From Swiss-Prot:
Belongs to the transferase hexapeptide repeat family. LpxD subfamily. Catalyzes the N-acylation of UDP-3-O-acylglucosamine using 3-hydroxyacyl-ACP as the acyl donor. Is involved in the biosynthesis of lipid A, a phosphorylated glycolipid that anchors the lipopolysaccharide to the outer membrane of the cell. Pathway: Bacterial outer membrane biogenesis; LPS lipid A biosynthesis. This is UDP-3-O-acylglucosamine N-acyltransferase. It comes from Polynucleobacter asymbioticus (strain DSM 18221 / CIP 109841 / QLW-P1DMWA-1). PANTHER family: UDP-3-O-ACYLGLUCOSAMINE N-ACYLTRANSFERASE, UDP-3-O-ACYLGLUCOSAMINE N-ACYLTRANSFERASE 1, MITOCHONDRIAL-RELATED.
Length: 355
């Protein structure tokens, strides 16, 4: 375990308090004990932080000044880690403690795995039971592929990527370094492409071969049961640093930029391009062939049916979506619609009486 000063130095925080103190983990403010670290990133919780039993708090400079001026019942002897972004610092400290108890995937190929002789698998990789690895697959160093995962022909998985059980990677899928792919994800299935060929008496939907691949950058996390379809003639691309929640559908030829977050049950239709640093709420949906500007925020359950060209905007609503501020005003009017109706009826009645 690292001492307080070692933690502060490793995570670029200023230390206030005893440098030699050692902590054994993290906990929320209401449950943290003297041997644990918690954090404060929202001024609304300052009073709770002051009264917390936590032995250390990760705080901003402004919150530190408040807590020192307003000490709680357990503040004596507390250590403070002062950071520009307490929430992000908490996340990095949490990663450190999580590594202490994380499973260790020993290098080697399980006897129940089926690996094509042409696959390139470094000795540092872990291949779990009942994994199937196809011809021409290339793995980087320290890749871990857990049980019952299917890796089809010519997939390329870069170093330090972790793939949980029961993931399906179709042929030609490319995955960057340090990615995490959770159970049940299906990457590289055919995109939903069919050409109509109908006449007055019948016809059919003609399948369009999906000959592109899926290309995933580095430091991407993909949630459980998420599906990312392969491109029709060009690739479906997920940019580096993006995080995708559970049960998200990403259709063929979609391009997701770098460092985007996409919450559960969102759906992005074919050939839509999402810019960098976008935030997409749960169950939001996008029509196809749109372009979404960088740093766009889309609220949950919002339907986007037109391209968004101005960066940094926040959209909310269903048919039509609109700027978030306009939606809030309209929602307030909608909540008071019955009162407005009653007032209009009264005005109409008074007008009739006067005439």
């Amino acid at each position: 375990m690292l001492t307080a000063i070692e933690l502060a130095n490793q995570f670029q925080a200023s230390l206030v308090g005893e440098a030699s103190t050692v902590f054994n983990g993290l906990a929320p403010l209401e449950r943290a004990q003297s041997s644990q670290i918690s954090f404060l990133s929202n001024p609304l919780y300052r009073k709770q932080a002051a009264d917390s039993s936590a032995g250390a708090l990760i705080v901003s400079k402004a919150d530190l000044e408040f807590l020192q001026a307003n000490p709680g019942t357990h503040s004596s002897g507390r250590v403070y880690f002062v950071a520009k972004n307490p929430y992000a610092t908490f996340a990095r400290v949490a990663q450190y403690f999580a590594r202490q108890s994380a499973p260790i995937y020993e290098p080697g190929i399980h006897s129940a795995a089926v690996v094509d002789p042409s696959a390139s698998i470094p000795a540092s990789c872990h291949i779990g039971p009942f994994v199937r690895i196809g011809a021409g697959v290339k793995l980087g160093e320290r890749v871990a592929i857990l049980g019952n995962t299917f890796v089809a022909e010519n997939c390329d998985i870069a170093s330090d990527t972790l793939i949980y059980p029961a993931v399906s990677l179709y042929f030609g899928t490319q995955i960057g370094e340090r990615c995490i792919i959770h159970s049940g994800a299906v990457i590289g299935a055919d995109g939903f492409g069919f050409a109509p060929d109908f006449s007055a008496t019948g016809g059919e939907w003609v399948k369009i071969p999906q000959t592109g691949n899926v290309v995933i950058g580095s430091d991407v996390e993909i949630g459980a049961s998420t599906t990312i379809d392969r491109g029709a003639m060009s690739d479906t691309i997920i940019g580096s640093g993006s995080k995708i929640d559970n049960q998200v559908q990403i259709a063929h030829n979609v391009v997701v930029g770098n460092c985007c977050v996409i919450a559960g049950c969102a759906a992005i239709s074919g050939s839509t391009k999402i810019g960098n640093f976008c935030i997409i709420g749960g169950a939001a949906n996008f029509a196809g062939h749109l372009t979404i500007a960088d740093r766009t925020t889309v609220s949950g359950n919002t339907s986007i049916i037109r391209s968004i060209t101005e960066p940094g905007q926040h959209y909310t609503g269903v048919y039509p979506s609109m700027l978030h501020g306009a939606w809030e005003k309209n929602a307030a009017i909608l909540r008071g619609l019955d009162k407005i109706r009653q007032r209009l009826r009264l005005l109409d009645k008074n007008k009739s009486t006067e005439s």
